[in-house]
Amino acid sequence: MNNNIMNLIAAIVLSLSIIFGWQYFVVKPEHKKQQQQIAMQKAENLKKQKLKALIKPASDLVVQEANQVQRIKIESESLTGSISLKGLRFDDLILKKYKQDLSKNSTEVRLFSPANTENAYFAEIGLVSNLSSVKLPNNDTIWNSDGEILSPEKPVNLFWVNEDGVKFLVTITLDENYLFTVEQTIVNNSDKELPVQSYGLINRKYIAVEKAVNILHQGPIGCINENLKEYSYDDIKDKKSEKFVASKVDWIGMTDKYWLSSLIPDKSSNYSSNFNYALTQGVERYQVDFISPVQIIKSGENFSITSRIFAGAKKVDLLDKYEKQYGIKLFDRAIDFGWFYIITKPVFYAMNFFYGYVGNFGISILIVTVIIKLLMFTLANKSYCSMKKMKNLQPEIDRIKNLYGDDKARLNQEIMALYKKEKVNPVAGCLPILVQIPVFFSIYKVLYVTIEMRQAPFYGWIKDLSAPDPTTIFNLFGFLPFSPPSFLMIGAWPILMAITMFLQQRMSPEPADPVQAQVMKFMPLIFLVMFSSFPVGLLIYWSWNNILSIIQQYYINKFN
């Protein structure tokens, strides 16, 4: 097949794939999300009128409960909040290192909120029994504590004794990041056998969840039987429940774009686990939970079991650390690196490595792009030489077409013989494009899903590499005092990317086919419009990649 035609097909397929992929996976879900939010808001307004007496802001409820029920204060460099001693519930948690947005008055990110608040989201670890006669701590139990503050330096010990003299002890420790360790001990001082089961749950109110787009997973997630399980909220709503019986549960939880809450049960046995949906009093709730097999504690014996709760930011190195330290399989997959995981995670590691030296992820992107370009130089050189040879062979190919145009078999045979004689690979020109596709999407994933890139600045007006360029040419990049609509937000970096793409085309061999040449001239304009809503970090990569390609082609032209 003619090399120019193949390049045209590859370029068009790549462009259309990105355009329609973006429309289908991002723009369309976002539009649907907006329509759903409008409808939900109307229903929510009616619902709030009915539930207004029941629902209070999280901060108000915490203050109210603090006056009625004692709470253990959580305080570390990473977290602040409290644990309710009524029912031993983790329901008040704020991430101190992260703000909601870049505004001066932005509040810190709240992860957990009490059960009857608007954004209810909480975790529990406790005990149940298959015998109703066994008196165990429950949601109404008021625990006694030996301390008022939980910190990395100060664990807390809780205790409660039932009417039969059975003693229940809980020790809670917190590391310097986001991991709580909960050790439960039962001292059976009664004269009866005590059947108990350990459980853990995470419960969340649906309206508090940001609607997910198809480019990443948000919702129930876990590693069960060494396989990653991911369910959208709609999946669980349709099924009502997804159950796993007597399974190896490494972890289960709920994930957002940047935040994760997960339960990590003791590894001493298998567990039954559930992903549930319930509609109660007009409020939609989702829950993930696990429960252990029945453990019989004989009279005079003790039993202990340890579980963990992770509640915080999905930092790559932190999840890797916990995965290695506690043997939590696939814990890093809570970050949705996508289909190109095998490429995406090394790309992140490379960016993070250079960030440690230069202190700016934008500069780190530039360095990684240079390395990728050097690794692909030989391939690009061969591709460029092949394209040039194909252009030089075009007159001979046209002559063969005129001779054997009616005999397709002979035509293909003669053209292939010409390629073999001149040592030309007709598909070589497509290889750099094919290789760049996974690299492109890997960098996009890194920018879009990793907490490290969230609100990471570059220079000048770029304050967040994971967000689109905030400027637009239609108000002269902010010099005119008005804000154009979103579809006119074509900023400086998209324009720079289009200019460098145009210059790169001028440096490349011009296609012999005039139709193809005309189509290729419009590609920078197409990419300009399409890329304007992409994360600016991706535009920095693409612009810099184009500049390096121009330098590379100049070098090849000069020495080849």
Curated annotation (Swiss-Prot):
Main location: membrane
Protein's UniProt keywords contain Metal-binding: no
Quaternary structure (record): Interacts with the Sec translocase complex via SecD. Specifically interacts with transmembrane segments of nascent integral membrane proteins during membrane integration.
InterPro entries: Membr_insert_YidC, Membr_insert_YidC_N, YidC/ALB3/OXA1/COX18, YidC/Oxa/ALB_C, YidC_ALB_C, YidC_periplasmic_sf
Residue intervals passing through the bilayer: 7-27, 334-354, 357-377, 431-451, 476-496, 522-542
Function noted in UniProt: Required for the insertion and/or proper folding and/or complex formation of integral membrane proteins into the membrane. Involved in integration of membrane proteins that insert both dependently and independently of the Sec translocase complex, as well as at least some lipoproteins. Aids folding of multispanning membrane proteins.
GO BP: protein insertion into membrane; protein transport
Organism (species): Rickettsia canadensis (strain McKiel)
The protein's name: Membrane protein insertase YidC
